[in-house]
A protein has these predicted regions:
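Rossmann-like NAD(P)(H) cofactor-binding subdomain of soluble oxidoreductases
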Residues: 50, 58-117
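Internal alpha-helical scaffold of NAD(P)-dependent oxidoreductase catalytic cores
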Residues: 98-107, 118-209, 237-244, 250, ...
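NAD(P)-dependent Rossmann-like dehydrogenase/reductase catalytic/cofactor-binding core
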Residues: 2-4, 26, 190-278
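Short, well-ordered alpha-helices that flank and scaffold nucleotide-derived cofactor binding pockets
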Residues: 20-24, 75, 99, 236
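Structural motif
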Residues: 50-54, 129
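Alpha-helix C-terminal capping/helix-to-coil transition sites in glycosyltransferase folds
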Residues: 46-47, 79, 125
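NAD(P)+-binding Rossmann beta1-loop-alpha1 motif at the extreme N-terminus of oxidoreductases
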Residues: 1-46
Length: 278
C-alpha cells in the first residue's frame, strides 16, 4: 500500500518539525524559495495529497500583516491536495483565500511550537486544532491520526482556529511583560525575587511557562520572530472593529521599555516586512 504524499511549503523550523513528524508514515516533498533548504520541485509538492503551508507572515511598519508569502503559495496551487495553512494569520484570512481561490481546498491548523524544541513539541502536542469545512477537516484528522495518538482534536471553523492561535501568543507575550513589571517592582523595593516567584507559582493556576526574568535568551522582555509581529498584528486588526485591546497594548509598551535588543527589527521577511502596504 502506497504512503500518503505530504508536501511542505516553507522549510523553516515549522516545516522541519512537520517533516520530522510525518516521515515515518508519509512520502514527503519539501519546497522552499531558498534553494539550500528546498528538497523537491514546486510541481511535485502541489501534486501531493496534503500540503502544509509554513511560510512567514511578517508585519508592516504599521503593525498590519504581510500576507504576500501566503498569497504566492495559493497563486500556484492546484485542486488536488488539501492545503493545511500553518502560518499564523488573522481571523478571516483562510475564509478570504478560500473565496478568492475557490478551486482549491484550504483549512487552517495553528502550530504551537517553540523554535528551540519544535520537533519534540510536534510529537507531544496537547491538542490539534483544525479549522475549516468539516468535510476537509475530517480528511486532515485522518492524516494526523496516522501519526499521532492525540484524543484532543478540535474541529471548528477557520476563523475560530485563527483567533485561538492569537489568544495563545498574545497571552504568553503579555504574561512575559507582567513578570517583567513584577521584577522591576521587586528590585525597586528590595524584595527577594526568587522567594516571591516561588510563592507565586505555587498557585497551580498560574502555570509554569513564560515566568523567568530574564527569559531563556538572557534578556528582558520578549523578542524573536513570533510574539512581536503577532501582538502588533492583533492590535492592528482589532482597531478595524473599534476594539481597544488595552491589556495587550500595555504589555507591548512594557516590552518596548525593557527590551534593549529589539531583534525582530533585524529579521526582515520573518518578523518585519519592508514592502509597501497595500
Amino acid at each position: 500500500m502506497s504512503k500518503t504524499k505530504v508536501g511542505i511549503l516553507g522549510n523553516g523550523f515549522v516545516g522541519e518539525a512537520i517533516s520530522f513528524a510525518f516521515s515515518p508514515v508519509a512520502d514527503l516533498y519539501v519546497y522552499d524559495t531558498d534553494p539550500l533548504k528546498s528538497l523537491d520541485d514546486l510541481e511535485s509538492v502541489h501534486n501531493c495529497d496534503f500540503v502544509f503551508i509554513c511560510v512567514p507572515t511578517p508585519m508592516f511598519h504599521d503593525g498590519s500583516q504581510d500576507l504576500s508569502y501566503v498569497e504566492s503559495t495559493f497563486e500556484k496551487a492546484t485542486s488536488k491536495p488539501v492545503y493545511i495553512l500553518k502560518s499564523t494569520v488573522l481571523p478571516g484570512t483562510t475564509e478570504g483565500f478560500s473565496e478568492k481561490y475557490s478551486n482549491i481546498k484550504i483549512i487552517f491548523s495553528p502550530e504551537f511550537l517553540t523554535e528551540r524544541t519544535a520537533k519534540l513539541d510536534m510529537l507531544t502536542q496537547s491538542r490539534i486544532i483544525l479549522g475549516g469545512e468539516l468535510s476537509l477537516t475530517e480528511k486532515v484528522k485522518t492524516l494526523f491520526n496516522q501519526r499521532f495518538k492525540i484524543k484532543n482534536i478540535i474541529q471548528t471553523d477557520s476563523k475560530t482556529a485563527e483567533l485561538t492561535k492569537y489568544m495563545n501568543n498574545t497571552f504568553f507575550a503579555t504574561k512575559v511583560s507582567i513578570m517583567n513589571e513584577f521584577k522591576m517592582l521587586c528590585d525597586k523595593i528590595g524584595a527577594n525575587w526568587e522567594d516571591a516567584l516561588r510563592g507565586f507559582v505555587s498557585d497551580g493556576r498560574i502555570g509554569d511557562s513564560h515566568l523567568n526574568v530574564p527569559g531563556h535568551d538572557g534578556k528582558l522582555g520578549y523578542g524573536g520572530t513570533c510574539f512581536p509581529k503577532d501582538v502588533n498584528a492583533l492590535l492592528s486588526f482589532s482597531k478595524k472593529y473599534d476594539i481597544e485591546l488595552n491589556t495587550i497594548k500595555g504589555g507591548w509598551s512594557t516590552n518596548l521599555n525593557v527590551r534593549v535588543d529589539k531583534d525582530w527589527e533585524q529579521k526582515e521577511g520573518r518578523s518585519v516586512s519592508f514592502k509597501k502596504t497595500k
